[in-house]
């Protein structure tokens, strides 16, 4: 079975970012299905009835708009910029993932699909997909690396509780990239009833654009909310980056405002200068994988290197093509945060604000801890909390040597 990193057909026009990132590098077996998805997205994204249906689910099911919360204690403790937290952790299912899943599931419904498949790393995208499949009466199958099923057992059970079948992926490094491979292989199998709900801003066009479109609600809201609270734009927007869906959603409404600094925070793991890292933009090089041209952790022969992070949601060996372009153009800055720094931030935000945030989000919080004291008191940071940290409590306790009964 061919996967999307085996280039058999490509488009030099579709979904390009910057000089040459993005595109469609896919096997022939997927081109027809991808064309159907592209047409449906382009036809429906601005359709008033589709937009009304999407908005109704976002408001009445997903609990939007999410709060823009002034982190008073953190602001006072760090002694610099005012810190606002965009609370995606308060969405139904506990993360930003639901925004994109609702949109793609509605596309699937309009295409007459009966079955949703998806990859997941930390499990949040899988939970969101299983949730919407249950709501819409669709079958659901989730592919998750065996390493991740072992460290996110609670989310595995949650998906099964919602009616999904979870497939532990035992190939490769048994992490997110391998889950993506397995899902792509399943999607390439002959079937007219299946829709692939891709969870991050990666893959062949139109997925990066589509995910950005559905996740841009994060920054559309935060821009309006901060205007109401402070009557100004933020000076900086900070979000964690794996594949990059929460970050591109957090950045989208500000990309054309050059006064707003955009900072994506990658997982440096044991250190960006070690081989136990997932700092793709800092360490990666241009390549083709999972249907797109972007930056990847790879060797001289173009083979994908293993990556590592304490965070199951950030240990992807690539990054979305728009992030690669934003980095190349200097419009956004990308920094690395280590496991130790993220774990410290997990404790810090809990004690300062009474919020147990996802370990993915705590990479962004750790950077805010560093940068806020260097900024003026009249400056403002918006930091996106991509999800809640219930799923991480046991693993963080284990990391710190605390014995807890899961």
Curated annotation (Swiss-Prot):
Disulfide bonds: none
Keywords per UniProt: Amino-acid biosynthesis, Aromatic amino acid biosynthesis, Lyase, Pyridoxal phosphate, Tryptophan biosynthesis
Pathway the protein takes part in: Amino-acid biosynthesis; L-tryptophan biosynthesis; L-tryptophan from chorismate: step 5/5
Quaternary organization: Tetramer of two alpha and two beta chains.
Lineage, top ranks: Bacteria, Bacillati, Bacillota, Bacilli, Lactobacillales
This protein's name: Tryptophan synthase beta chain
InterPro entries per record: Trp_synth_b_CS, Trp_synth_beta, Trp_synth_beta/beta-like, TrpB-like_PALP, TrpB-like_PALP_sf
Species for this entry: Lacticaseibacillus casei (Lactobacillus casei)
CDD domains for the chain: Trp-synth_B (cd06446)
CC cofactor: pyridoxal 5'-phosphate
Alphabetical list of NCBIfam families matching this protein: trpB
